[in-house]
Amino acid sequence: MRRSCLMIRRRKRMFTAVTLLVLLVMGTSVCPVKAEGAARQMEALNRGLVAVKTDGGIFVSWRFLGTENASVLFNVYRDGQKLNAAPVKTTNYVDKNGSAGSTYTVRAVVNGTEQPASEKASVWAQPYHSVPLDKPAGGTTPKGESYTYSANDASVGDVDGDGQYELILKWDPSNSKDNSQDGYTGDVLIDAYKLDGTKLWRINLGKNIRAGAHYTQFMVYDLDGDGKAEVAMKTADGTKDGTGKVIGNANADYRNEQGRVLSGPEYLTVFQGSTGKELVTANFEPARGNVSDWGDSYGNRVDRFLAGIAYLDGQRPSLIMTRGYYAKTMLVAYNFRDGKLSKLWTLDSSKSGNEAFAGQGNHNLSIADVDGDGKDEIIFGSMAVDHDGKGMYSTGLGHGDALHTGDLDPGRPGLEVFQVHEDKNAKYGLSFRDAATGKILWGVYAGKDVGRGMAADIDPRYPGQEVWANGSLYSAKGVKIGSGVPSSTNFGIWWDGDLLREQLDSNRIDKWDYQNGVSKNMLTASGAAANNGTKATPTLQADLLGDWREEVVWRTEDSSALRIYTTTIPTEHRLYTLMHDPVYRLGIAWQNIAYNQPPHTSFFLGDGMAEQPKPNMYTP
């Protein structure tokens, strides 16, 4: 009953507002039901067919699309020969007689009628696919310090409209800096690659964009609804687009002696995803203004950026750009339509009445419809911003490094947020709250900075997702579980055949043995490397190919290639591709920002889950 309904909640500031609730009464229980909203624009994906050689034959896997009915079945073909006697319901198949030279297709069967064949898939020789990269040459700073490049965070979008994802990759110089550190950095480079390694373009953000996790937040999404993804990010004088055109003054250099850029114009540019061509450039907002307004005068807190994609009207995507979270905080929303950028709203914590929204942001954000109106809200650390740019609530618990938003507790209506907090004087070092109202459902005092926290269903003995932080594991109700915790507090990934989530850290995937309280290794990707130092995050984690399980993208140790790893473990569970889930897809868009976090779904995906709701979507 829980997952077939969603409570339409009042915001805290709207005590007198009239809220329409459709009430379903069963015995003594009352379940508020969300009215059906408008369909959302989503990507027109192909089958994502993948075939991988295993010891038991060829493992074949494909997408179940959000546009398809639950009754659809499939036929699997090898070299034009149908393999299954009767149509199969699963979205994976093991061909025991396949060979390395085989080619596979699948055909949907709708009401007994076979549909056209999918794209063809050749067999991978190993459980990963290599995407060769054009590694850039290093350089030298104005102080004579040399640097090299390594592949860093990535995102995905269908930039050419063929139904297959392309990879958008950030190159990080070896001298990239945290905002707290002085020093010059190399230029930030952004590349686009097809999965066969074809490089589509390279954007050089130039000397006036500093390199580091908090500076460049790149959004890859079909913003204008033409069926092809754009790329949006902060730019500056000297940025060179994918066609070689320079934005602004090519000779300008605003770096000070500390290598920081605290003066000069700032721009927001939308680039064509297929070519890297500049489509439109506007003045960047939130604007810098006075550096000292943001919490210090040397340029640390002024340049703390985040970004995201949100369906503010419930139907089409908008761009969110943010600045600041330790003190002054600003969020600005834009639409990119018909070749033009238009600003929708600004939330500024320095404005009268917004004081509660200062100093509450994280190094990450989440985006979801938390109040049931069909329109997305921005979960900005310890606060939330409504689709219209007005603050919904602030818990006052302040900044933190990790944040998880989803249906963490299926035993109660709506979505929840699990967050850790940095302030040692905060009432809670880790908190579990109602995503719509900010009500703290439970929390644990820490008395110190709790730097990491994770949420995933890893123990079927307890309903909902478990959460762990500060050396302890808890149920969704706040009950402490045992004395051990998983081997990592980083990412979670759906990898094996059950509905529980595995742990992803560095170049490893582990599974929590809940009965014995230890983690067991499932995969160690030899020759692959994680990113971002001690954060040890993947280049990307997402449901990129095949069935609903997730792929992980790591760089090779020398950054000569990216490797897309996929599971080869059969599963009886069939779910719509996670990339057609509204919360999950937006989680992939924001995954590259600042301190990367794993995506979550709009519904509870775990042991004992109810039937997954069919995505309410359309494709351009």
Swiss-Prot record:
Main location: secreted
Residues annotated to bind Ca(2+) 2: D158, D160, D162, Q164, E166
InterPro entries to which the protein is assigned, alphabetical: Ig-like_fold, Integrin_alpha_N, RGI_lyase, RGL11, RGL11_C
GO molecular function, one term: metal ion binding
Impact upon substituting H399A: Strongly reduced catalytic activity
Induction of expression: Up-regulated by growth on type I rhamnogalacturonan.
Superkingdom, taxonomy of origin: Bacteria
Cofactor names: Ca(2+); Mn(2+)
Effect of E422Q: Loss of activity
Reaction catalysed by this enzyme: Endotype eliminative cleavage of L-alpha-rhamnopyranosyl-(1->4)-alpha-D-galactopyranosyluronic acid bonds of rhamnogalacturonan I domains in ramified hairy regions of pectin leaving L-rhamnopyranose at the reducing end and 4-deoxy-4,5-unsaturated D-galactopyranosyluronic acid at the non-reducing end
EC category name: lyase
Annotated signal peptide: 1-37
Chain positions recorded as Ca(2+) 8 binding sites: D457, D459, Y462, G464, E466
Binding-site list for Ca(2+) 4: H363, H399, D401, E422
A Pfam family per the record: RGI_lyase
GO biological processes: cell wall organization
EC numbers on record: 4.2.2.23
Entry note: thermal dependence: Optimum temperature is 60 degrees Celsius.
Co-factor note (free text): Binds 10 calcium ions. The calcium may have a structural role. Requires calcium or manganese for activity.
Binding site for Ca(2+) 10: D543, L545, D547, R549, E551
Residues annotated as binding Ca(2+) 1: D153, N592, A594, N596
Role of this protein: Pectinolytic enzyme that degrades type I rhamnogalacturonan from plant cell walls and releases oligosaccharide products. Degrades rhamnogalacturonan, polygalacturonic acid, pectic acid and pectin.
Alphabetical list of PANTHER family matching this protein: RHAMNOGALACTURONAN LYASE (EUROFUNG)
Homology family: Belongs to the polysaccharide lyase 11 family.
Name of the protein: Rhamnogalacturonan endolyase YesW
Lineage per the UniProt record: Bacteria, Bacillati, Bacillota, Bacilli, Bacillales
Name of the encoding gene: yesW
